[in-house]
């Protein structure tokens, strides 16, 4: 079905000798589900872009080697022909939307095939039922949460039923239930004969259905494991490879979190409406200095909206106090640092190191501090690179470093580890713990059970815009 022979690719304007893919040989048969694994920046996303034709037709660069798709030379195919054979779900779902309505978006690809209206209606009903997203039909796309957008992107591609489906971290922003449903959907597609390539850091939701795991390092395929071989790898072996365990960490919550008058951060009766919908309703909680609060809940529960409201990015009802002082919206924005889910919104400078110098008077000491922070997050080799050239996981780590260097006492992170491998997850946990030890108050919006288990002191759970519980995390001493 797919045959890559000696594929190498170098992006335009890359440094001399710097290739993103090096001599990749890979054969994938019809009906296989293959995981592409490896540390952030190892070349997984670039490989998916070669498979769907975006490299070099959309991302300019030098591509060498051979690529056969169903026996045809894919490198000579018109992009529209390749697009009918290979369906893609990108790392950032926003980059593949063409409409503003969810139902229109799911239908659009089928209209371009084209399919009969009755067939399209049947497929929309089937895929939305399998993914449990009927509630998202006929909604405006822009107000949706990142996880809900990801679900729409997945549904739009799966409804087309292409021969080959290439997904780049499709579970990054999904809650645990949605991940399970995605795993079931991929299993059904695989059983129906579709070929699936999955670039992922989270493996548990496809444990029962994947056939092989392709491990990449520095743009090369380092190892290929059968399903049994991959599942036999110990946690220590996976950690040495920079990968996460095949099963997510578990944790227990204890009694209710008890607020204290001296809590550094106090939120009272926050309510918010967006696009005519009640997103938050009377949310009240507090956080302590030196503690890490995880904000959890299903996709669309209002987690990101809550954090945008309390950091002053959204208008809302209710009050927020920091260090005992009531703060208006603009004051809250100055007192806090909010790391958004979409890293591109917060990166403006021409180089990575220059991100630390925005709005500051440059000095050797400031530059040295920035380089030290980059080194801490494994980003020092990219100091002079443009931020847009980084991988998704590298951009996330850059924003974590910027938050750490901001000097703010309230740090809020929206899915800070969604695109991170096991190695960089551990780096992130170490940094978060260090920031907490300095007396800062940290809020983490996350679906990542590994992050909650390793870093969180307490969990605040939202559902349908309401606070369901706020409890301490029980951890073995």
Q: Across the structure, where does each feature detected by a protein language model lie?
A:
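Conserved ABC ATPase "signature" region
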Residues: 118-136, 365-382
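ABC-family nucleotide-binding domains
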Residues: 175, 421
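Conserved ABC ATPase signature
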Residues: 140-144, 148, 386-390, 394
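H-loop/switch region of ABC-family ATPase nucleotide-binding domains
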Residues: 200-201, 446-447
């Amino acid at each position: 079905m797919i045959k890559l022979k000696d594929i190498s690719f170098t992006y335009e304007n890359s440094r001399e000798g710097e290739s993103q893919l090096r001599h990749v040989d890979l054969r994938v048969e019809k009906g296989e589900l293959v995981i592409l694994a490896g540390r952030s920046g190892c070349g997984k996303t670039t490989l998916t872009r070669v498979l769907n034709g975006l490299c070099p037709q959309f991302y300019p660069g030098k591509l060498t080697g051979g690529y056969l798709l169903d026996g045809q030379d894919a490198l000579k195919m018109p992009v529209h022909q390749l697009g009918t054979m290979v369906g893609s779900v990108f790392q950032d779902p926003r980059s593949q939307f063409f409409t503003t309505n969810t139902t229109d978006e799911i239908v659009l690809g089928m209209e371009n095939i084209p399919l009969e209206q009755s067939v399209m209606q049947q497929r929309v009903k089937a895929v939305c039922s399998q993914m449990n997203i009927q509630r998202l039909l006929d909604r405006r796309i822009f107000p949706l949460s990142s996880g809900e957008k990801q679900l729409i992107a997945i549904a739009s591609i799966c409804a087309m039923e292409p021969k080959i489906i290439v997904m780049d971290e499709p579970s990054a922003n999904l809650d645990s239930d949605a991940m399970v449903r995605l795993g079931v959907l991929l299993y059904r597609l695989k059983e129906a004969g579709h070929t699936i390539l999955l670039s992922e850091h989270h493996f548990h939701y496809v444990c029962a259905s994947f056939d092989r795991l392709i491990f990449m390092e520095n743009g090369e395929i380092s190892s290929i494991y059968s399903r049994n071989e991959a599942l036999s790898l110990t946690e220590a072996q996976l950690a040495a490879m920079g990968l996460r365990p095949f099963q997510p960490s578990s944790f227990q919550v204890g009694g209710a979190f008890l607020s204290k008058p001296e809590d550094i951060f106090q939120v009272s009766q926050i309510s918010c409406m967006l696009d005519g919908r009640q997103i938050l309703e009377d949310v009240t909680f507090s956080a302590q200095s030196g503690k890490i609060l995880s904000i959890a809940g299903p996709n669309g529960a209002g987690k990101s909206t809550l954090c945008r409201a309390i950091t002053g990015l959204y208008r809302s009802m209710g009050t927020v106090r920091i260090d005992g002082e009531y703060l208006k919206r603009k004051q809250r924005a100055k007192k806090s640092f909010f790391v958004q889910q979409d890293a591109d919104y917060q990166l403006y400078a021409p180089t990575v190191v220059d991100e630390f110098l925005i709005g500051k008077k440059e000095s050797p000491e400031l530059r040295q501090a920035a380089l030290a922070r980059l080194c801490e997050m494994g980003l020092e080799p990219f100091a002079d690179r443009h931020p847009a050239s980084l991988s998704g996981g590298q951009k996330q780590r850059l924003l974590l470093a910027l938050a750490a260097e901001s000097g703010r006492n309230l740090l809020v992170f929206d899915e800070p580890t969604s695109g991170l491998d096991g190695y960089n997850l551990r780096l992130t946990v170490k940094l978060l713990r260090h920031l907490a030890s300095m007396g800062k108050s940290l809020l983490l919006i996350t679906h990542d059970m590994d992050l909650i288990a390793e870093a969180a002191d307490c969990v605040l759970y939202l559902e349908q815009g309401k606070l369901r519980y706020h409890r301490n995390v029980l951890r073995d001493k």
